[in-house]
Amino acid sequence: MKETRSKQPDITPDMLLRAYSIGLFPMADSADDPELFWVEPEIRGIIPLDRFHVSRSLAKAIRRRPFDIRFDTAFAEVMEGCAQPAPDRPTTWINDTIRSLYAALHNMGHAHSVEAWEGDALVGGLYGVSLGAAFFGESMFSRRTGASKICLVHLVERLRSKGFQLLDTQFTTEHLKSFGAVDVPKAQYEVLLAKAIASPNLEF
């Protein structure tokens, strides 16, 4: 995937929001590397909110209500879950700098978590950034089958109900494509982003 990278040693929360507003997002090479770099993909992944697809099997699982779904009650714990190695993710880019920046955005009302709980146990979740009428999905994790998928369904329901226009997934995967994620060229993405960012900040 072609992308633009540029090192950025000292990122503030306000700088991070500005970066999102123009199509950039930060990453680190590893959890142990304190440096961040900006990423600007030439091809961007989005999930069109009006074309979100839920498979029959997942819809059936959701109807069984296997988890208690909560919003913004354990943001730091969700980030920690996303930072843990998984079979499809042996390493993580979530370093201490990322944790602290997104915790600050959460305190500012611009970063949010969707959580799947079994009793008192957090078993899956996702987090991302809201700005204007755009939501930028960052990462997700599961400790039970289907937990992150069910969180994504609840995220989309919430975004639709609040009037969000853009769900940015940064890149696409086969997993996300099963929900309707598509690749769009940078120029097309910038048009969608500008429209969503022109909106006042929507309540999540």
Swiss-Prot record:
> What SUPFAM superfamilies is this protein classified in?
Acyl-CoA N-acyltransferases (Nat)
The protein's UniProt keywords, in alphabetical order, are: Acyltransferase, Cytoplasm, Transferase
* UniProt xrefs under InterPro entries: Acyl_CoA_acyltransferase, Leu/Phe-tRNA_Trfase, Leu/Phe-tRNA_Trfase_C
Q: Which GO terms describe its molecular function?
A: leucyl-tRNA--protein transferase activity
Name any Gene Ontology BP term: protein catabolic process
At the top of the EC hierarchy, this enzyme's class is transferase
Q: Name one GO cellular component term.
A: cytoplasm
Q: Which domain of life is it from?
A: Bacteria
**UniProt keyword annotation of Acyltransferase present:** yes
Its annotated compartments are: Cytoplasm
Q: What is its EC number?
A: 2.3.2.6
Q: Which reaction does it catalyse?
A: N-terminal L-lysyl-[protein] + L-leucyl-tRNA(Leu) = N-terminal L-leucyl-L-lysyl-[protein] + tRNA(Leu) + H(+); N-terminal L-arginyl-[protein] + L-leucyl-tRNA(Leu) = N-terminal L-leucyl-L-arginyl-[protein] + tRNA(Leu) + H(+); L-phenylalanyl-tRNA(Phe) + an N-terminal L-alpha-aminoacyl-[protein] = an N-terminal L-phenylalanyl-L-alpha-aminoacyl-[protein] + tRNA(Phe)
Q: What does this protein do?
A: Functions in the N-end rule pathway of protein degradation where it conjugates Leu, Phe and, less efficiently, Met from aminoacyl-tRNAs to the N-termini of proteins containing an N-terminal arginine or lysine.
- Give the HAMAP family listed for this entry: Leu_Phe_trans (MF_00688)
Tell me which family the UniProt entry assigns to this protein: Belongs to the L/F-transferase family.
Q: Would you tell me the protein name for this molecule?
A: Leucyl/phenylalanyl-tRNA--protein transferase
Organism this protein belongs to: Rhizobium meliloti (strain 1021) (Ensifer meliloti)
